[in-house]
Amino acid sequence: MDGDYIKTLSSEERIIFLKIFCCLVRADRNIDAEEISFLKTIAARYGVDNNTVIGIIKMQNIDFVAEARKITNRGHALQLVKEMCVLANIDNDLADAELDIVIDCARAMGVEDEKIVLINRWVLDSLILTKTGQIIMEVNNG
């Protein structure tokens, strides 16, 4: 996760990102340790306290498309798509429901389908390189 963009997000945008991440985590009805770790890490990087995150996780009826439409800055939209792709792929199981949320949010922000594919490929390549590096360096990530 490249954190430079975080400094440019408003507090409202940070909450929007977290709401969408929580919808994505719940999409496949199987919340993995990697996904929880991602949420904790990103919330800390966004400067959002745990109580706020817990409150967001407990929200049942988040309209993620309406939330995504609030992101009007192109750079922020692309960063959100990237982070969503990381989160959706982090458990090595990209479910159809997760993919649907990524696509619906991206489209709501005006991100082209071709750009979504390119971002997802880049994220997958990065994840593969990271895992390969861990194997080469004999790093136990377990």
Identify the residue ranges that each predicted region occupies.
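Small-residue-enriched hydrophobic alpha-helices in membranes
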Residues: 1-25, 30-142
